A protein has these predicted regions:
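Periplasmic/extracellular loop-to-transmembrane helix junction in inner-membrane transport proteins
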Residues: 9-21, 45-82, 97-98, 245-253
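Membrane-interfacial helix termini and adjacent extracytoplasmic/periplasmic loops
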Residues: 10-16, 54-62, 67, 102-103, ...
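Transmembrane alpha-helices
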Residues: 29, 82, 112, 159-177, ...
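N-terminal signal-anchor/first transmembrane alpha helix
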Residues: 12-44
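C-terminal transmembrane helix and the adjacent membrane-cytosol boundary/short C-terminal tail
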Residues: 3-4, 25-29, 40, 44, ...
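Transmembrane-helix boundary motif in ABC transporter permease subunits
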Residues: 17-18, 60, 79-110, 123-127, ...
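Interhelical loop and adjacent transmembrane-helix boundary motif
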Residues: 19-20, 57, 64, 222-272
């Protein structure tokens, strides 16, 4: 009597067949956490800002000092983000495309702001450009203001935000390799043409994503900017600093009005980030089909 040598495979238990109660419990816990930690506080900010109506809200945003803080925030972000964009692309290109001594050290330096408190970052600039330092004496003698002025705010913001673009691009460029660039160079393209027509299209989504994160952090930075700003009303206060000042003065409508504007900027950043991810996923799917 012959034995059937066919072995029926044992049906593996899939994660998707786990007990429904466990699945729904995990989903409920996640949603509850987001509700308590994120959505309720965010809603409270908007409710408090409009508690007295739209008139006081708009009046608070139209205050001269608040308007100056909004304008200064946009100026600082508008200068620091493009500078960090240029640095991030250059650093990512060097690390991903070339081999050189000190490469690991450069990568570590890029990550430094992630591990250093923003307050310490601000103190570094105070120690570097302070009035009692050699460099501070030289700056004073030449009537150049760094601390308690816009240049100090820009430097502090750049220090805190410069890893974002580079950290988005480095793994992306390493994964892509150097084959495309080498092919372009072998066909006679210049370095600039290679970057503009080959490298940049390949990294555009990661680049935009890094810029969004960098801009969001630049507008919301508090610690480093607080140390170097001097809290001069109407001159060196950014939006986060203005929120603190108004709140400490019990001007809750003004404080929450500015906080609402910051929250809206964060929401816009989140929406743009989601759209970029969707566009990138669609582009990847289309390229795989072809």
């Amino acid at each position: 009597m012959a034995l059937d040598a066919t072995v029926q495979p044992t049906k593996l238990r899939s994660v998707t067949t786990e007990h429904r109660m466990a699945r729904y419990t995990l989903i409920a816990v996640s949603l509850l956490f987001l509700l308590l930690i994120l959505l309720l506080p965010l809603a409270a900010v908007f409710v408090e800002a409009f508690r007295k109506g739209a008139g006081p809200f708009l009046e608070a945003l139209g205050d001269a000092e608040t308007f100056s803080a909004i304008r200064l925030t946009l100026v600082v972000a508008g200068i620091s983000v493009p500078l960090n964009l240029a640095f991030g692309v250059a650093a990512a290109w060097a690390i991903a495309k070339f081999e050189f001594k000190g490469k690991a050290f450069l990568t570590t330096l890029i990550d430094l702001p992630f591990s250093v408190s923003p307050v310490i970052s601000g103190l570094v600039f105070v120690l570097l450009f302070g009035a009692n330092t050699w460099l501070g004496h030289w700056l004073t003698a030449n009537d150049i203001k760094i601390l308690f002025a816009v240049p100090g705010l820009i430097l502090a913001t750049m220090f805190v935000t410069f890893p974002f673009v580079a950290r988005e691009l480095i793994p992306l460029m390493q994964e892509q390799g150097t084959a495309d660039e080498e092919a372009a160079l072998s066909l006679g393209a210049s370095g600039w043409q290679t970057f503009w027509h080959v490298t940049l299209p390949n990294i555009k989504w990661g680049l935009l994503y890094g810029v969004l994160l960098c801009n969001a952090r630049a507008m919301g930075e508090f610690g480093a900017v607080s140390v170097v700003s001097g809290h001069i009303r109407g001159q060196t206060n950014t939006m986060p600093l203005q929120v603190e000042i108004l709140y400490n003065e019990y001007n809750f409508t003004g404080a929450f009005a500015v906080a609402t504007l910051l929250a809206l900027l964060a929401l816009v950043t989140l929406v743009l980030k989601t759209l970029l991810e969707m566009r990138y996923s669609a582009e990847i799917s289309a390229s795989r089909r072809h």
